[in-house]
From Swiss-Prot:
GO terms for cellular component: chloroplast; mitochondrial large ribosomal subunit. Pfam families: Ribosomal_L2 (PF00181), Ribosomal_L2_C (PF03947). Disulfide bonds: none annotated. InterPro entries: NA-bd_OB-fold, Rib_uL2_dom2, Ribosomal_uL2, Ribosomal_uL2_bac/org-type, Ribosomal_uL2_C, Ribosomal_uL2_CS, Ribosomal_uL2_dom3, Ribosomal_uL2_RNA-bd_dom. One of its GO terms (molecular function) is structural constituent of ribosome. SUPFAM superfamilies: Nucleic acid-binding proteins, Translation proteins SH3-like domain. Belongs to the universal ribosomal protein uL2 family. The gene is rpl2-A. Residues 1-24, 224-254 are annotated as: Disordered. This is Large ribosomal subunit protein uL2cz/uL2cy. The keyword Ribosomal protein applies. GO terms for biological process: mitochondrial translation. Part of the 50S ribosomal subunit.
Length: 273
């Protein structure tokens, strides 16, 4: 990803480092409007997810996570910005006339050819079952359930690694450090998701954050005791507790949020870092 730095003409642009990917008009038949209801509120209008609200209107791009155009080669026509994710997307024109969006693989350029199916070449952007991939292959957009479409390693710069195959299962090391089992019949895309430098962007000003639908975050230590467990005290005071807590008194850092005794625990060989 190319990072664009502005001239230091104003305080808001002095520290801004934004994505220079050009915005383009998406294909009309592959988009639809979405009603972003609530924006952090429930049906009664009560805040259930803090720091959300506002933001620019978005059109949702239909992304082909299934890659079910089997054994039909396609050509990358455009590489586009998608407001609904931090990864880029690219428009594919297939040989049978079908046009679809997929996640942009790192290093893919306009004019490259991709294909999905069984026994296809192990090259960037191709999608095939895990059983046909050699060990050590870098992959993304990985299926958990056969035919459901890719669900793992879809964020910008995400990449997983195929480290073992035994019986009906394949062992993957995910970007989070988790090691888990997946059916060998599930499909994945070869390569890494593009826009690797997405986490290096610096918006530079609060207004850019507001466009993304993210509201300001207030520290609990500057609140009153009635509003937050960290609040209160004379002047600048510490939180007054051994460990940080949420506004509702639960442990804030290091607490495991995964559901206990979840059905998929048997497939996880090593928990994420």
């Amino acid at each position: 990803m190319a990072i664009h730095l502005y001239k230091t003409s104003t305080p808001s642009t002095r520290k801004g480092a934004v994505d220079s990917q050009a915005k383009s008009n998406p294909r009309t038949k592959l988009i639809y409007g979405q009603h972003r209801c609530g924006k952090g509120r429930n049906a009664r209008g009560i805040i259930t997810a803090r720091h959300r609200g506002g933001g620019h209107k978005r059109l949702y791009r239909k992304i082909d996570f299934r890659r079910n155009e089997k054994d039909i080669s396609g050509r990358i026509v455009t590489i586009e910005y998608d407001p609904n994710r931090n990864a880029y997307i690219c428009l594919i024109h297939y040989g049978d006339g079908e046009k679809r969006y997929i996640l942009h693989p790192r290093g893919a350029i306009i004019g490259d050819t991709i294909v999905s199916g069984t026994e296809v070449p192990i090259s960037m952007g191709n999608a095939l079952p895990l059983t046909d991939m050699p060990l050590g292959t870098a992959i993304h957009n990985i299926e958990i359930t056969l035919g459901k479409g890719g669900q793992l390693a879809r964020a910008a710069g995400a990449v997983a690694k195929l480290i073992a195959k035994e019986g009906k299962s394949a062992t993957l090391r995910l970007p989070s450090g988790e090691v888990r089992l997946i059916s060998k019949n599930c499909s994945a895309t070869v390569g890494q998701v593009g826009n690797v430098g997405a986490n290096q962007k610096s918006l530079g000003r609060a207004g850019s954050k507001c466009w993304l639908g993210k509201r300001p975050v207030v520290r609990g230590v500057v609140m009153n005791p009635v509003d937050h467990p960290h609040g209160g005290g004379e002047g600048r005071a510490p939180i007054g507790r051994k460990k940080p807590t949420t506004p509702w008194g639960y442990p804030a850092l290091g607490r495991r949020s995964r559901k206990r005794n979840k059905y998929s625990d048997i497939f996880i060989l090593r928990r994420r870092k």
